[in-house]
Amino acid sequence: MGRVIVITSGKGGVGKTTTTANIGAALAKQGKNVCVVDMDIGLRNLDILMGLENRVVYNLVDVIEGTCKVKQALVKDKKLPTLSLLPAAQTRDKTAVNADQVKELVTDLKAMFDFVLVDCPAGIESGFQNSIAGADEAVVVVTPEMSSVRDADRIIGLLEARKNELDSYRLVINRIKPDLVNANQMMNIDDICEILSGELLGIVPDDEDVVVSTNKGEPLSLTANKSAGQAYRNIAKRIQGEDVPLMDIKGKGFFGKLKAIFS
């Protein structure tokens, strides 16, 4: 059986869907059979980031409603034969499915793939509850901004309330700017991890090539010699249990201010 990993954030706009696409592509490139699932019903974007928007015929809601079989809805990646996408419905809303239905679906996918990555919609309402149903573990994506860290803290509280169902959660800190960290103008990695009491899965530096790759529908993790791409490849290796060193980014100065916000 495979592993189901929900990728969540709480706050929108932190790069959660980009993270899902890049980790999925990296895992597939490293030889794993991977399915990425877009749970943002009504606002799907994962197909665009993967360059598969013109190949979508059926979607997740069609599978749950019995309109098609799950294999009919899966869209194979054009370059990576072991990577598949299960797209969200674009013309429905989050009430079209419930947590029990999603749990049954991801259980079926676990039997078909080594890894199932569920791209969770922003927020803590029904879309979040549906997305974590059946997940084995969670990845919380956060940026070094106070609002993002506070929202992630809320999400982690909800994940910890389901610790009997989830094995673990780990953090991916996205859009780090080393120069600002070292100049004490951006929250530092240790401070974020201490506030969120989470294990660090990876650090992704801010990289303008992410925008370019998104517009081209080509995950950056497939591109050699790009710092963010290498970061995603390292995250994929850590997910598989490899001991890969983290980037060395230092910086001090924010924690006293932050403790007042989170206390």
What are these model-derived regions, one by one?
Residues 39-111, 214-215, 221:
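P-loop/Walker-type NTP enzyme "switch/lid" segment
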